[in-house]
Curated annotation (Swiss-Prot):
Comp. bias intervals (Basic and acidic residues): 42-53, 388-397
Protein name (database record): Terminase A protein
Keyword Hydrolase (UniProt): yes
Acidic residues: bias regions: 374-387
Location of region: Disordered: 42-62, 304-325, 356-397
Quaternary state and interactors: Multimer of two distinct subunits.
Residues that span the membrane, as ranges: none
Presence of keyword DNA-binding: yes
Organism: Escherichia phage P1 (Bacteriophage P1)
The entry's keywords: DNA-binding, Hydrolase, Nuclease
GO molecular function: DNA binding; nuclease activity
Task of the protein: Necessary for recognition and cleavage of the phage packaging site (pac), together with the pacB protein. Both are probably the two major subunits of the phage PACase.
Length: 397
């Protein structure tokens, strides 16, 4: 529909039904400001001098009273066309009104969260009834405004939860307050949803005031923030408690190790144990060997005592004798000489193989004698290394 059609429809509805521009814009799903701009001037033009709307259009006076029977057929056709046009306009207006109503209904159904709130309300109500059971299995009735004071039943529910989890006195007190606050906050949330639901049912359908849905959303956002804060508080308390418990276990374990080490030293003095035996006793009882005892064990293992009766050859306590040192030195020298002999023999074999296969001996690879090269004198800056030659080829070569 064009704005001309809207002007005609608005003029008819304003004349017959007393429609306002706002109502017309809502009926036809129009922008109120745009409708007001287009229809206001037309509305002012349609008013009469005495501000009364004529029920029927004013007909112009006939210029002549001459009856022209030749135009009767034309006049009848004109009246029929006007009636058909009026019916067509009425059908268009009715269809537009129905379409606008359907669109408004779809918009209201889409924006209305009555079903969501009902499901949430029912779930929270069931949870509230489930959480309001005391230790004896008795159910108490929740009254509006209970969340404003200290809820005893919430404290009882919190104590029951803490007894199942296990905690000390301080942690129990802190968690009890946090959990009771959390339960009371959930009760307040459930009550607010119920009250806003009742208020929405009682509220009339008008354009003024904040919709209840926005109030519910604001309340749920606040409750979510508070619940998250309480959950973080409870989580921090539990972590601190676990950390303190681990520290206490470590302290007890260290104190137990100190007792085991002390008992090992006492047994060492009483039974004349060695340091190694005392360390074995500590490890057998789950303790940790002290660093000083470990150093003593390492020193004893590096320098064991000798079982010789010769006091002249005996050095300081725990040190090897001079004969042992001389024997060890001779064995190592013989081992080095044997290794050197093996190395020289191996090198001789490698050089002989190179000379024989590479043609560097008396005869080259092609069978030609190398005497000319062997008899060649050394350069001025070259000297024959007789020691190396003697080691490689012997004195006879």
């Amino acid at each position: 529909m064009t704005w001309d059609d809207h002007k005609k429809n608005f003029a008819r509805l304003a004349r017959d039904g007393g429609y306002t521009i706002a109502q017309y814009a809502a009926e036809f799903n129009l922008n109120p400001n745009t409708a007001r701009r287009y229809l206001r001037a037309f509305k002012e033009d349609t008013r009469t001098t005495d501000s009364r709307k004529p029920n029927k259009p004013v007909r112009k006076p006939l210029k002549s009273m001459i009856i022209d029977h030749s135009n009767d057929q034309h006049a009848g056709d004109h009246i029929a066309a006007e009636i058909a046009e009026k019916e067509r306009v009425n059908a268009v207006v009715s269809a537009a009104v129905e379409n606008a109503k359907r669109q408004n209904k779809r918009i209201n159904d889409r924006s209305d969260d009555h079903d969501v709130i009902t499901r949430a309300h029912r779930t929270l109500r069931d949870r509230l009834e489930r959480d309001t059971l005391d230790d004896d299995g008795e159910r108490f009735e929740f009254e509006v405004g209970d969340y404003l004071i200290d809820n005893v039943e919430a404290r009882k529910a919190a104590r029951a939860m803490l007894r199942r989890s296990g905690a000390d006195v301080l942690e129990t007190t802190l968690l009890e307050k946090s959990l009771s606050h959390l339960l009371m906050l959930e009760n307040a949330r459930d009550t607010c949803i119920r009250l806003v639901q009742e208020m929405r049912d009682q509220q009339k359908d008008d354009d003024e005031g904040t919709p209840p849905e926005y109030r519910i959303a604001s309340m749920l956002n606040s409750c979510s923030a508070q619940i998250s804060s309480l959950i973080n508080t409870i989580y921090s308390i539990r972590n601190n408690y676990r950390k303190e418990s681990r520290e206490a276990e470590k302290h007890a374990l260290s104190m137990g190790q100190a007792g085991i080490v002390k008992l090992a030293y006492e047994r060492k003095r009483e039974n004349n144990w060695s340091v190694l035996e005392a360390a074995e006793f500590i490890e057998a009882h789950g303790g940790k060997v002290p660093p000083l005892m470990l150093e003593q064990i390492k020193a004893d293992l590096r320098a064991p005592k000798t079982n010789t009766d010769d006091e002249e050859n005996q050095t300081a306590s725990g040190a090897p004798s001079l004969e042992d040192l001389d024997k060890i030195a001779r064995e190592r020298a013989a081992s080095r000489r044997a290794d050197a002999a093996l190395w020289i023999e191996h090198r001789r074999e490698e050089i002989a193989d190179i000379v024989d296969t590479g043609g560097y001996g008396d005869v080259d690879a092609e069978g030609i004698s190398n005497e000319a090269w062997l008899e060649q004198d050394l350069d001025e800056d070259e000297e024959e290394d007789e020691e190396v030659t003697r080691k490689l080829y012997g004195d006879d070569d």
